[in-house]
Curated annotation (Swiss-Prot):
Cited SUPFAM superfamilies: Release factor
Record-linked PANTHER family: LD18447P
GO molecular function, one term: translation release factor activity, codon specific
Cross-referenced HAMAP family: Rel_fac_1 (MF_00093)
Biological role stated in the UniProt entry: Peptide chain release factor 1 directs the termination of translation in response to the peptide chain termination codons UAG and UAA.
Similarity comment text for this entry: Belongs to the prokaryotic/mitochondrial release factor family.
Pfam families (UniProt xref): PCRF, RF-1
Description of post-translational modifications: Methylated by PrmC. Methylation increases the termination efficiency of RF1.
GO cellular component terms, A-Z: cytoplasm
Keyword annotations from UniProtKB, A to Z: Cytoplasm, Methylation, Protein biosynthesis
Positions bearing N5-methylglutamine: Q237
UniProt protein name: Peptide chain release factor 1
């Protein structure tokens, strides 16, 4: 390991001890915002410190085995060879693990997120596929122990959704789900197709982190137009008799958010404001990213929602992720919620890109 990296790790261990002390300070405990920020930092530093301690222990084992190789006793030298080999591998493996822990993290990775699914080209078939994507994400969330809450939905008469917005709550949610942003194309034979022809349709998915209140963009109330209306279900029939649904328009940007899933107008308004905050923050982040003109390929899709990231081919039972040239003939499993089959290779590729960028900087 490079001495500069080792020194950086020792600084992080010092900071970990400092944060640990601050968290038990009554002044910190009484300041909820500060306590929350330090708790988050503690969790990240705890992981690094723990692995760094393992590294130092593995280094000690390696040094001991190295000394044993120089022993006068041939039996001792023979025994030391295996220990030396194991210790050398352990040092290399833990060094790799530390390298990944030291990669720059997206500060939003631990946040909850909003997922918007919209039916695109393909009419009813696209809406049905939007419903399939919602089911796939719901099953995946269930496996991960995450909680899903539908914020707004516009059902299609033939089944599925013209659009749906959900909130996903859980640990490390945005860090996983952000790779789902982009265009999702489906190829299959619709139930109404008598000739057995394969049709192509598409949906777009947008994933945005939930913005904590402390970090939220300040929105001027004068910039908002708030409308109330009756919540409606599939086909437009009214499902309640009060104007509990909310539509908020942010006049300067033209961003419109609707929420009608809750019976309470107050709850729908709070949810709509959360989604609006996330959309405005996303627009600001995308503007900053495009100005930076990063040379690194980005596996998280940009604001161009038409950018196709994945194809689901049902006749062949195939799913292809175009960003990393991944093809899997396990479509049924993936649609049933085994999304880790796709997510893990994408996250690994993203880590590899970051490591390559880090190597270039050094």
């Amino acid at each position: 390991m490079k001495s500069s990296v080792y020194q950086k790790l020792e600084v992080l261990v010092e900071r970990f001890e400092e944060v640990q002390a601050l968290l038990s300070d009554p002044a910190t405990i009484s300041d909820q915002e500060k306590f929350r920020a330090l708790s988050k930092e503690f969790k990240q530093l705890d992981a690094v410190t723990s692995v760094f301690n393992n590294y130092k222990s593995a280094e000690d084992d390696f040094s001991t085995a190295e000394l044993m190789l120089k022993d006068d006793d041939p039996d001792m030298r023979e025994m030391a060879q295996e220990e030396f080999k194991d210790a050398k591998k352990a040092v290399a493996d833990i060094a790799d693990e530390l390298q990944i822990l030291l990669l720059p993290r997206d500060p939003n990775d631990d946040n909850n997120c909003f997922v918007e699914i919209r039916a695109g080209a393909g009419g009813d078939e696209a809406a049905i596929f939007a419903g399939d994507l919602f089911r796939m994400y719901s099953r995946y969330a269930e496996k991960k122990g995450w909680k899903i809450e539908v914020m707004n939905s516009n059902e299609s008469e033939q089944g599925g959704y013209k659009e749906l917005i959900m909130k996903v709550n859980g640990e490390g949610v945005f860090g996983h789900m952000k790779f789902e942003s982009g265009g999702h194309r489906v190829q299959r034979v619709p139930a109404t197709e008598s000739q057995g022809r394969v049709h192509t349709s598409a949906c777009t998915v947008v994933v945005m982190p939930e913005i904590p209140e402390a970090d939220a963009i300040e929105i001027n109330k004068a910039d908002l137009k708030v409308d109330t209306f009756r919540a409606s279900g599939a086909g437009g029939q009214h499902v309640n008799k009060t104007d509990s649904a909310i539509r908020i328009t942010h006049i300067p940007t033209g961003v419109v958010v609707e929420c009608q899933e809750q019976r309470s107008q107050h709850k729908n308004r709070a949810q709509a404001m959360s989604v609006l905050q996330a959309r405005l923050q996303q627009a600001e982040d995308e503007k900053r990213r495009s100005e930076e003109e990063s040379s690194r390929r980005n596996l998280v899709a940009s604001g161009d929602r038409s950018e196709r990231i994945r194809t689901y081919n049902f006749p062949q039972g195939r799913m292809s992720d175009h960003r990393i040239n991944l093809t899997l003939y396990r479509l049924n499993e993936i649609m049933e919620g085994s999304l880790q089959l796709v997510m893990e290779p994408i996250m690994q590729e993203n880590q590899a890109d970051l490591l390559a960028e880090l190597a270039e900087q050094h």
